[in-house]
């Protein structure tokens, strides 16, 4: 059946800030305590969505989560009215207020792992929200993610939204940031590719400096849950040395689309074996496989991490050609810029490069790929999605005006103690659910 890939980008929330919460994420740590601009962050992300929609891509939006999370703070023993709780946490445990206020749900590549209906044993699209149990500020996301996905993809004849895996390090799951899918055509059966950093029960190399967040056991559990066939599933271990260099998810060192894998030379343990298995399993589906492996001599791992070359979107345009969507930092790094010029000058799967200003997200370690969740949908499935979430001229205008009305243009870490920020955020989110047609999505609306 004819199908296409839709991208659902996370709308940056009103509490976007730089608290340095993500150990192993170099940009997050380097920009700790900087002053953020939530309004600019949200508009940068929205402009990317609009430009891609204008180019003919199916582009949706996922709403922010409620922050600060008063549920978390109350579960951690703080009581009183909301203002009292915020004041107490700010005084006694400011690091918990920072975690409860994080806008990290904007990076929807970590929202869930998605398998299209062509791959699953029951012919439905499967979603497993990621437990994100390696970081407190992200481990609180999956319940809201599940509620949002079940609201947007509510036709249970076509969609299955599972619970997150149990939140233990043995099943640490970071979602689609460590998953991609290869196929000849989106609607055809494909090979799903799961990348992990460590195994709880198998011996193997592990990073020494920064933690590996994705376990093999989690990847395998998601594949089993989604009803994927063994002959169309590949597991690969991420190179622990690149994790120690700041590659905290596989989408910082590799990106795939249809029958093309674009990756760094040092992305994987035993890369040739990985490529061979992908090629063999795709061949069994009568699909080709292309690898564009970037040599370390041309783009070092450090350059890849600082520019986010691989945290890009690789998209198939309506004319069948592929385009790479990169952050502007790629043009500001002379070695990466030279590589991209060479890439598009030669004959190959990637014909063009689109550059976006995503500076506010990038300073927290999130490029174009982090901001989007890929969902392959056929025509009937796409028609079953809540209609108000698709980006077009009208929705863009309404969201742009909504951001202008509700978002601050300056947010320092000290501003998280302001009880008015919670009220501002709730007012904004209440209006947003009406714009998107999502009903009473948030706890404060129920």
UniProtKB/Swiss-Prot annotation:
Active-site feature positions: 174, 249, 370 (nucleophile)
Key words, A-Z: Arginine metabolism, Hydrolase
Substrates-to-products reaction catalysed: N(2)-succinyl-L-arginine + 2 H2O + 2 H(+) = N(2)-succinyl-L-ornithine + 2 NH4(+) + CO2
This enzyme's EC code(s): 3.5.3.23
Record pathway: Amino-acid degradation; L-arginine degradation via AST pathway; L-glutamate and succinate from L-arginine: step 2/5
Record's keyword annotation contains Hydrolase: yes
GO molecular function: N-succinylarginine dihydrolase activity
InterPro entries: AstB_sf, SuccinylArg_d-Hdrlase_AstB
Residues engaged in binding substrate: 19-28, 110, 137-138, 213, 251, 364
Annotated GO biological process: arginine catabolic process to glutamate; arginine catabolic process to succinate
Similarity section: Belongs to the succinylarginine dihydrolase family.
Its biological purpose: Catalyzes the hydrolysis of N(2)-succinylarginine into N(2)-succinylornithine, ammonia and CO(2).
HAMAP family in the cross-refs: AstB (MF_01172)
Assembly behavior: Homodimer.
Stated name of the protein: N-succinylarginine dihydrolase
Taxonomic source organism: Paraburkholderia xenovorans (strain LB400)
């Amino acid at each position: 059946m004819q199908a296409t890939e839709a991208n659902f980008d996370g709308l940056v929330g009103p509490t976007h800030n730089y608290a340095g919460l993500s150990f192993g994420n170099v940009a997050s740590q380097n920009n700790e305590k900087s002053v953020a601009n939530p309004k600019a962050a949200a508009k940068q992300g929205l402009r990317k969505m609009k430009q891609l929609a204008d180019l003919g891509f199916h582009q949706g939006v996922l709403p922010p989560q409620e922050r600060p999370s008063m549920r978390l703070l109350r579960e951690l023993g703080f009581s009183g009215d909301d203002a009292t709780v915020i004041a107490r946490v700010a005084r006694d445990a400011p690091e918990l207020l920072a975690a409860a206020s994080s806008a990290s749900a904007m990076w929807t590549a970590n929202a869930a792992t998605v398998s299209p209906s062509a791959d699953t044993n029951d012919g439905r699209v499967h979603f497993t929200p990621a437990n994100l149990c390696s970081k407190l500020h992200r481990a609180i996301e999956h319940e809201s993610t599940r509620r949002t996905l079940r609201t947007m993809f509510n036709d249970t004849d076509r969609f299955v939204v599972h619970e997150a895996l149990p939140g233990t390090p043995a099943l640490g799951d970071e979602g689609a940031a460590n998953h991609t899918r290869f196929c000849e055509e989106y609607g055809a059966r494909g090979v799903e590719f799961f990348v992990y950093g460590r195994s709880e029960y198998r011996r193997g190399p592990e990073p020494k400096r920064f933690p590996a967040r994705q376990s093999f056991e989690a990847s395998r559990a998601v594949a089993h849950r989604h009803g994927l066939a063994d002959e169309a599933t590949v597991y690969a271990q991420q190179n622990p040395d690149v994790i120690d260099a700041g590659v905290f998810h596989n989408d910082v060192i590799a990106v795939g689309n249809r029958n093309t894998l674009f990756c760094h030379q040092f992305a994987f343990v035993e890369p040739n074996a990985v490529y061979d298995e992908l090629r063999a399993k795709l061949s069994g589906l009568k699909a080709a496989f292309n690898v564009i492996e970037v040599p370390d001599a041309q783009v070092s791992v450090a350059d890849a991490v600082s520019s986010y070359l691989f945290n890009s979107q690789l998209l198939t345009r309506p004319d069948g050609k592929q385009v790479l969507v990169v952050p502007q930092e790629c043009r500001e790094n002379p070695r990466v810029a030279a590589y991209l010029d060479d890439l598009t000058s030669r004959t190959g799967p990637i014909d063009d490069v689109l550059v976006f200003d995503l500076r506010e997200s990038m300073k927290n370690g999130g490029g174009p790929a982090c901001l989007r969740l890929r969902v392959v949908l056929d025509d009937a499935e796409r028609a079953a999605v809540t209609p108000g979430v698709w980006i077009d001229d009208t929705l863009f205008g309404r969201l742009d005006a909504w951001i202008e009305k509700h978002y601050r243009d300056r947010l320092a870490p000290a501003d998280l103690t302001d009880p008015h920020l919670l009220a501002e955020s709730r007012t904004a989110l209440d209006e947003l659910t009406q714009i998107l047609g999502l009903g009473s999505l948030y706890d404060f609306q129920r």
